[in-house]
Amino acid sequence: MRSFAPWLVSLLGASAVVAAADTESDVISLDQDTFESFMNEHGLVLAEFFAPWCGHCKALAPKYEEAATELKAKNIPLVKVDCTAEEDLCRSQGVEGYPTLKIFRGVDSSKPYQGARQTESIVSYMIKQSLPAVSSVNEENLEEIKTMDKIVVIGYIPSDDQETYQAFEKYAESQRDNYLFAATDDAAIAKSEGVEQPSIVLYKDFDEKKAVYDGEIEQEAIHSWVKSASTPLVGEIGPETYSGYIGAGVPLAYIFAETKEEREKYTEDFKPIAQKHKGAINIATIDAKMFGAHAGNLNLDSQKFPAFAIQDPAKNAKYPYDQAKELNADEVEKFIQDVLDGKVEPSIKSEPVPESQEGPVTVVVAHSYKDLVIDNDKDVLLEFYAPWCGHCKALAPKYDELAALYADHPDLAAKVTIAKIDATANDVPDPITGFPTLRLYPAGAKDSPIEYSGSRTVEDLANFVKENGKHNVDALNVASEETQEGGDVTEAAPSATEAETPAATDDEKAEHDEL
């Protein structure tokens, strides 16, 4: 399972550390003997903790190497540690998955790397880490700073306006991982940029190249503006940008197209629409050859392109555009407006509702979710699973056994439901980040489900339902009493949990398969 998780001395000549460097590689290999001294001699280091067999590590390797080469010129070293050879070192650094990327400012000061795992993102992120939260601007470095990153925010603030500067500096501190910030109190520089003091200007390498803030100097207002101004009118969805779009707080419109030429044409066609609805929805193209499978997640035919769909992450809602229609910008704009106005019902992917329930575990589909999980006065434990998930398959017999504890007793079944839903074949209201995910929806508090993270034994799951459900049903006690009543006095049979449920092993604990 993956987990995610200046002032530098030159790498050449200045370091007394002997670090094993791979041939013709700018990524430096460290071990137990070299790690501490290297970190203490370098003011800023990005470290990758990896395993040679790890697929994600192999995918990252060439990008990490390219970033190391580019950052070497800026005296920002990138290092790596093989955790299969350095188990103690990796354990001491809290490594729980591969690859783990950490930023070090000395051996005792580290934090997780939070950027994308792409060359450009690694370089941009680490450059921002090497600079102060707010860099100083003068006539000589203005143009260099304006183009130092894809997004640069500069405050033109007079020296006597400390209130505005302090608000700007505070915001910069909170967002230094995401944007590059600078400031100047020179009125002449502000004038040369066509702005009056105080002003905040966002420079970018796309669209209109710069935007000037005209709102209140307040953290939330500034942040909302920066997020909006830094988003292209029509961008491109990929590994580097996806999380930003999903976390933007507004719906996202996807334009699936197979060729670069098509995507460029749609970009131009949709720019006026994006400008009209800026701040209400983001619009972006996506390479259908590389990421066409994602169309299926939006309830589109993933074999038919071009295609268009809107996703509202806040509502977990999807609005696919009719693929039988031509993808005409003017017609699609009407669809966008109708979605924003609430005139379009979201598309819900669902398996057929079972005609009858077979077995102790209740099968839930999207169209029965509300009735079986939400609109009732029962404590409902729901497993979100995927058919291909190994951990889900391992859980299945124990989950059946758990469900039988309740289903075999009408008085318990009236208060507790043990259920499952195939989250790959049915749309579910809340995001699922791994399989299996187990959530308890207590009676009277369905809007506050409780996610289970303990060992997946029958006993522990039953106790979880008892302790967190409204009805506090103790199914284990009922089962134990029945066993004792039906067994021989001198040689009582062990309970179901004693006979069939071994102590949890490491593999039985709350592992998840990646989505």
UniProtKB/Swiss-Prot annotation:
Residues 490-504 have a biased composition (Low complexity). It is an enzyme of class 5 (isomerase). The keyword Repeat applies. The record marks R456 as: Lowers pKa of C-terminal Cys of second active site. GO terms for biological process: protein folding; response to endoplasmic reticulum stress. It comes from Aspergillus niger. Participates in the folding of proteins containing disulfide bonds, may be involved in glycosylation, prolyl hydroxylation and triglyceride transfer. This is Protein disulfide-isomerase.
